[in-house]
């Protein structure tokens, strides 16, 4: 029987599942809307092939929430023992919550498959560069998946990996280890979510909206009329309905973030993942600008996070002690 390693990306636009059999490249198997998972559960919401992969997996690596309570890849049952939330002490963070993640975690626990939670990238990670410790949080755990896939494909161990979709998050990899990055609420916006500007701060202080509400609508949607604010459809609307000009605006902002990190940390290559990596107009602008700062600019599949998490699941099953400089917590 073929061994199957599964990655599950609990993202803004849905829960994505990929699998890796130890040969070739990981394969994206399907996606389930978060609202549907919250109502029906993960397995009943996935396409058949993805459901079977989850049920038959030798090892699963997944992300859930911000991941700030974890500093290692942690067995699911150990993370749950930490309490309420992710890690599982705290699910609170940025973005809209539907309850799908908690339902997913509970279901996987009952399934009995070996499953590991990916930690977030935050100031308590031992390998984090000191400059990034000024920020409490740099990225949630699925970005480790995106970085793992990029390293698998890259000819360099010094790269910037950017995931741009509902939001934009960039991660710096030096000597094959994640040392920092820029979170969605700090740097370039995505389609739906983005940093808090002066207008947002004033509205928050005036009690007109919450900080999370400001972040959740801080992306390029606030200045364009071609995409709405539904987290499960905003990105596809942007790709299908917005023109070259709007895509160029966003691409310039993403390029600003990625190029800055690349110059400061002397990185050779830039790898772009997330749903927008599949849009030719957006990527054309990004590649043209970033080629001035990097020896190579390449796109990753839109499902790169789940695919990379599947590779990490295989690393864990093979007995690796760490991935990307992040330790793996082993059962006694």
Curated annotation (Swiss-Prot):
InterPro entries linked to this entry: ATPase_NBD, DUF1464, Methan_mark_12
Classification via Pfam families: DUF1464
Coiled coil: none
Entry similarity comment: Belongs to the UPF0285 family.
Stated name of the protein: UPF0285 protein MK0078
């Amino acid at each position: 029987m073929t061994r199957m390693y599964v990655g599950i990306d609990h993202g803004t636009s849905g829960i994505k599942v990929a699998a890796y059999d130890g040969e070739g490249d990981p394969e994206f198997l399907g996606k389930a809307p978060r609202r549907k998972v919250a109502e029906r559960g993960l397995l009943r919401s996935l396409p058949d092939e993805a459901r079977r992969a989850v049920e038959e997996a030798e090892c699963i690596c997944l992300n859930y929430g911000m991941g700030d309570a974890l500093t290692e890849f942690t067995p699911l049952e150990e993370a749950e023992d930490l309490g309420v939330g992710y890690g599982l002490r705290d699910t609170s963070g940025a973005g809209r919550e539907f309850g799908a993640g908690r339902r997913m975690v509970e279901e996987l626990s009952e399934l009995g498959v070996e499953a590991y939670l990916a930690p977030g990238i935050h100031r308590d990670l031992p390998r984090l560069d000191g400059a990034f410790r000024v920020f409490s949080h740099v990225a949630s755990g699925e970005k480790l998946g995106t970085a793992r896939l990029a390293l698998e494909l890259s000819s360099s161990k010094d790269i910037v990996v950017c995931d741009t979709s509902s939001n934009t998050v960039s991660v710096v990899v030096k000597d094959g280890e994640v040392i920092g990055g820029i979170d969605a609420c700090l740097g370039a916006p995505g389609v739906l979510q983005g940093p808090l500007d002066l207008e947002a701060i004033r509205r928050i202080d005036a009690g007109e909206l919450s900080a999370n509400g400001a972040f959740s609508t801080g992306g390029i949607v606030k200045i364009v009329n071609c995409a709405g604010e539904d987290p499960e459809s905003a990105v596809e609307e942007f790709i299908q309905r917005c023109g070259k000009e709007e895509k160029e605006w966003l691409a310039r902002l993403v390029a600003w973030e990625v190029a800055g990190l690349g110059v400061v940390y002397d990185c050779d290559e830039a790898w772009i993942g997330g749903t927008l990596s599949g849009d030719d107009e957006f990527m054309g602008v990004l590649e043209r600008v970033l080629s001035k700062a990097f020896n190579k600019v390449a796109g990753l599949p839109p499902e790169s996070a789940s695919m990379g998490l599947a590779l990490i699941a295989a690393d864990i099953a093979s007995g690796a002690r760490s991935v990307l400089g992040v330790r793996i917590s082993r059962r006694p």
